[in-house]
Amino acid sequence: MIFMAYRDFKLAEVVKQFELSLVNARLFEDLVPINSSNWLNETLEISLNFALKSGSEKARSEFIVAPILLEMERINNQNFAIYSGINLDADKDRGLSGECDFILARGAMNYAIQSPIFALVEAKKNDVESGLAQCIAQMFGAQIINLRNHDENSISA
């Protein structure tokens, strides 16, 4: 079998392999928006231009996504941890393996990731379909890890 990673999935492949139906739905329309802090506004004001002009995924991750996740963690009293660039090997035989952009996990930041986990994929520049395929694959990987570790506190990712 040829080794695949999360990033290698194409949308049609992931839909077929995991027997999915794509449905467009408005999931969060009833949520009340919250105001961002002065810190986040100032940080994004400084970093946004640089991140967008650099054109790299890594710069967008470091200068746009990470500050937003840190703000979310602060608002939620550090009740979840943010892990960046961690390998999540859920099921190598099905291609559910490889590096995740971000993993959000229960509890405070620690050396051992606490389940349940949630995989977060950054938008891919000019390629929504590729990012969506990677996101679906990583969410399946996270689901496998969560089910495997249902009765345990920590996982080895």
Spans of model-derived segments:
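A short, conserved, highly charged catalytic patch centered on acidic carboxylates
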Residues: A5-Y6, A12-V14, E19-N24, L31-I155
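Short, Lys/Arg-enriched N-terminal segments with co-localized hydrophobic residues
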Residues: M1-F3
